[in-house]
Swiss-Prot record:
Homodimer. InterPro entries: cNMP-bd_dom, cNMP-bd_dom_sf, Env_Response_Regulators, HTH_CRP, RmlC-like_jellyroll, WH-like_DNA-bd_sf, WH_DNA-bd_sf. Activates transcription. Positively regulates PcrtB promoter upstream of the crtB operon in a cAMP-independent manner. Regulated genes include genes encoding DNA photolyase, phytoene synthase and cytochrome P450 monooxygenase, which are involved in carotenoid biosynthesis. Positively regulates the light-inducible gene cluster in the megaplasmid in a cAMP-independent manner. Residues 110-182 form the HTH crp-type domain. This is Transcriptional regulator LdrP. GO terms for molecular function: DNA binding; DNA-binding transcription factor activity; protein homodimerization activity. Pfam families: cNMP_binding, HTH_Crp_2. It comes from Thermus thermophilus (strain ATCC 27634 / DSM 579 / HB8). One of its GO terms (cellular component) is cytosol.
Length: 195
């Protein structure tokens, strides 16, 4: 088991893929750096999920994996895995594929406001969420929301300010409080599957 701090890189695009990973605790995102310098989130890895699947083929990692929270990760040697273990990996990757397809639809449908609402509701069901006296919140930056909604930070900040003015959310440093879940769900239009 290995611990990673928030924002720490687990592997980089182009590195030789020798290890398949299983997330034990926390939240990881798989990202790609675009030619224009923007970072986009391709998928979120939840506890129990496998990632770094390029190791199953003995290829280089195609994307970069980064911890979004403190994360505990188990490294696995694919050649040492038995048939049943590989079957568990395949089932998990199939489940992740369904989430990725839902995520693709999320990015391609609706205005930015709807995409942000869907993403905040999605994060509420991940290790990025917590509760305090003010209610349920997610720990996320404007930049991370932009990366996950095919947008830019400035546009995200404007939408969050509008949602805050309307009483749907409140914000603090790296926290977005979800004050009116029903209204956010109406804004979202459809759910982004977390599990």
């Amino acid at each position: 088991m290995k611990r990673f701090a928030r924002k720490e890189t687990i592997y980089l695009r182009g590195e030789e893929a020798r290890t398949l990973y299983r997330l034990e605790e926390g939240l990881v995102r798989v990202v790609e750096l675009l030619p224009d310098g923007r970072l986009i989130t391709l998928r979120h890895v939840l506890p129990g999920d496998y990632f770094g699947e390029e190791a199953l083929e003995g290829k280089a990692y195609r994307y970069t994996a980064e911890a979004m929270t403190e994360a505990v990760v188990q490294g696995l040697e694919p050649r040492a895995m038995d048939h049943e273990a590989l079957h568990r990996v395949a089932r998990n990757l199939a489940r992740q594929m369904r989430r990725v397809q839902a995520y693709e639809a999320h990015l391609q449908t609706g205005e930015l406001r709807a995409r942000i609402a869907r993403y905040l509701l999605f994060l509420a069901d991940t290790p990025l969420s917590a509760r305090d006296r003010q209610g349920i919140y997610v720990t996320v930056s404007h930049e991370e929301i932009a990366d996950a909604t095919a947008s830019i930070r400035e546009s995200v900040s404007k939408v969050l300010a509008d949602l805050r003015r309307e009483g749907l959310i409140a914000t603090a440093y790296r926290r977005v409080y979800l004050l009116d879940l029903a209204a956010l769900e109406r804004e979202a239009g459809s759910a982004l599957e977390a599990a």
